[in-house]
């Protein structure tokens, strides 16, 4: 699910929610057209931090006030945050859930009060969502595992770093990984375990595996870039170089790792683009507009061949990219391809 920002304090506070006016037109009292949309995310990971910037950009251009909360990877905290947003009477709620099988009562409550509640980036197992803006995590897992299988020549030993167990990202990326592994009986999984999307946890997990398996480890498949970067740090500290690592998300450090050769590749899930799309769907629902409520974000593969363009969008020319984000988001909603951003290899419908 992926650089701590100025709102990192929210994550540390867990249950504390912070309303951020992102409309540039004054507060709600000053402008009755302002829409208040509540947001609760699993944690302020690098991915979410980048995504928040995209949502803020879209909100400012569309007279939306965002009320932000981070659940610090705690299901009960997130449930309380959704309850609070419902009680505040926000116009819509966006949830990036901690766990797929959570928030059933909260979703039902929002629906009964006519508040559209959307799951974005990670799924919720409920039929009562007003919107469901999701990445194709199965395809992303298959894509990263195929990269690794190709690099290993279909033979070798790997370890797998998983997201938080029970979250839709972990479940579905794992399904994709397993689909590809089934075609390569000579690739053995030495170990797999969660590092909860976190770089520091992945460092410790990888150190333990290096201690247990040593030179038997031929590759590292990480379900997100942050964990892959943690594995990279542990391998370097152990004096091991050249072990192929693959990740998912295309955060700044992950893209730089692809460019340097420390990663063999990643799958770009540009949080700036994806979360902006989620907000655009929520905004359309609030306004009563026709909109596809379940668009799918298909992540492009990022390798040395196209990483430079991805780095421009995420890092070096980020402000230029943000300046065009609202137009891009609206165009993508029309075409149905919410992941399109002109990366070589992508084709616009």
From Swiss-Prot:
Keyword Lipoprotein set for record: yes
What PROSITE patterns does the annotation carry?
Answer: PROKAR_LIPOPROTEIN
Task: List GO BP terms, alphabetically.
Answer: carbohydrate transport; cellular response to carbohydrate stimulus
Induction details: Up-regulated during growth on D-threitol relative to growth on glycerol.
| Residue numbers binding xylitol | 42, 121, 173, 224, 249, 269
Keywords, A to Z, come to: Cell membrane, Lipoprotein, Membrane, Palmitate, Signal, Sugar transport, Transport
Leader sequence residues: 1-22
GO molecular-function terms, A-Z: carbohydrate binding
Q: Where is the lipid attached (S-diacylglycerol cysteine)?
A: 23
By sequence similarity, the record places it as follows: Belongs to the bacterial solute-binding protein 2 family.
Role: Part of an ABC transporter complex likely involved in xylitol import. Binds xylitol.
Name of the protein in its database record: Xylitol-binding protein
């Amino acid at each position: 699910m992926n650089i701590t920002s100025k709102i990192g304090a929210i994550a540390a506070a867990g249950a504390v929610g912070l309303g951020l006016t992102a409309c540039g037109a004054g507060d709600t009292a000053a402008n009755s057209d302002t829409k208040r949309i509540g947001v609760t995310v699993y944690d302020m990971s690098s991915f979410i931090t980048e995504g928040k910037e995209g949502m803020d950009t879209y909100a400012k251009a569309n007279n939306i006030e965002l009320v932000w909360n981070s659940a610090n990877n705690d299901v009960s905290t997130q449930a309380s945050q959704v309850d609070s947003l419902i009680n505040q009477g926000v116009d819509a709620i966006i949830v990036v859930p901690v766990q797929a099988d959570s928030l059933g009562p909260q979703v039902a409550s929002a629906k009964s009060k006519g508040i559209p509640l959307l799951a974005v980036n990670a799924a919720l197992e409920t039929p009562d969502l007003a919107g469901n803006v999701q990445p194709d995590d199965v395809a992303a897992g298959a894509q990263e595992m195929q990269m690794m299988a190709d690099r290993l020549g279909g033979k070798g030993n790997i370890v797998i770093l998983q997201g938080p167990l029970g979250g839709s990202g972990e479940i579905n990326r794992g399904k994709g990984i397993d689909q590809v592994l089934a075609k390569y009986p000579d690739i053995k999984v030495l170990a797999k375990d969660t590092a909860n999307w976190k770089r520091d946890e992945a460092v410790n997990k990888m150190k333990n595996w290096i201690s247990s398996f040593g030179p038997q480890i031929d590759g590292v498949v990480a379900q997100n870039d942050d964990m892959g970067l943690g594995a990279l740090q542990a391998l370097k500290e152990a004096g091991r170089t050249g072990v192929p690592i693959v990740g998912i998300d295309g955060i700044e450090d992950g893209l730089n790792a692809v460019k340097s050769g420390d990663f063999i590749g990643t799958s770009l899930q540009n949080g700036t683009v994806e979360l902006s799309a989620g907000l655009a769907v929520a905004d359309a629902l609030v306004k009563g507009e026709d909109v596809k409520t379940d668009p799918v974000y298909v992540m492009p593969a990022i390798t040395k061949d196209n990483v430079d363009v991805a780095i421009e969008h995420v890092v070096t020319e980020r402000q230029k990219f943000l300046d065009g984000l609202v137009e891009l988001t609206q165009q993508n909603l029309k075409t149905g391809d919410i992941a399109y951003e002109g990366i070589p290899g992508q084709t616009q419908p």
